[in-house]
Amino acid sequence: METKIVKTHTGKIYVDIKNRLEFLTVGDYGKENNIKANFLGLTKEINGVANTEVDLSKKWVATISTQKGCPMKCKFCDVPKYGFYGNVSIKELSYQIETIIKNEEVKQTERFNVHFARMGEPTWNKNVLDFSLILKDLVKKCGLKAETVHPVISTMLPKANKNLKEYILKWCEIKNEFYNGEAGLQFSINSTDDEQRNELFDGKSLSLHEISELAKELPMPKGRKYTLNFPVTAQTILDAKKLSMLFDKSKFIVKITPIHETNSAIENGFEVSGYSDYDVYRKFEMPLLNEGWDVIVFVPSKEEDSDRITCGNALISYEKKRDNSNGND
């Protein structure tokens, strides 16, 4: 497979045009620099994140694609501009991890996180479940000694997926038993208003009531709790009391991030700001804390968005360059 590499401030984006794959490796600035989480003892408000050197030997994040493009049509994401060309195979999932590891000199890390969150909705692809069972051995086979291998599934909860509950329950079993709690599950909630959610997810996600009913069937998490993810803008509706009625605080935490500055987010009128001002996060965080929620606020650096590390951008850019070089518009 022929893969191009795009260097970013925090890592690399890999682009395989022929096989329609895009995947990402990044280091981390350190949780004390880009995370506020009172329940973890990280109580300092983050007013801007400085772009500094990252240390892969501490924490290394690989974000890989589970589909070639995506069938979801989320209004804040650029991947729909690329199209959808099917699921990624186990061989292609392995290839992404192998490529990420072999292109770095680091051979030992405290933590290797694998996010199934690049292009695609992972719950449409059963290969992700099977792959997670060989992931730890694959990492070792690639020559990386990782004290912890921590895979994470992030889902938009597609309502057309009739096997969604079965899939998520299987993932919970893998998280709790095979990984002994060292794995993650994130639900993309984004709003506590169904009308706003329908706009964001183009009507393709379950309703809040349906997600709440599904959440009740999840086993108690071992290790880390499950995550309710809220990429926020100034327009986001996040009613802390309603969230408390819908979800169990003993099972879930809340994660607040900004919506990334994608072309689609800008075109659809989302206010994508807040990288250097904690006020935009505080107004969502405080009511949740008052309701007794464990809350993580993740603040990226402005450079991370300027790198266009969000899903699909590098692949779309290379496709345009190729088309232009072939004389196409």
Predicted stretch roles:
Residues 1-40, 207, 213-329:
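Auxiliary Fe-S-binding modules of radical SAM enzymes
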Residues 1-66, 88, 93-108, 327:
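N-terminal [4Fe-4S]-dependent radical SAM core
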Residues 31, 72, 121:
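Active-site micro-motifs of SAM-dependent methyltransferase domains
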Residues 56-63, 69, 78-218, 225-234, ...:
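Core AdoMet radical
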Residues 70, 74-77, 311:
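Disulfide-bonded cysteines in secreted/extracellular proteins and peptides
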Residues 72-74, 194, 263-265:
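Short acidic/His/Gly/Ser-rich catalytic and metal-binding motifs that mark active-site loops
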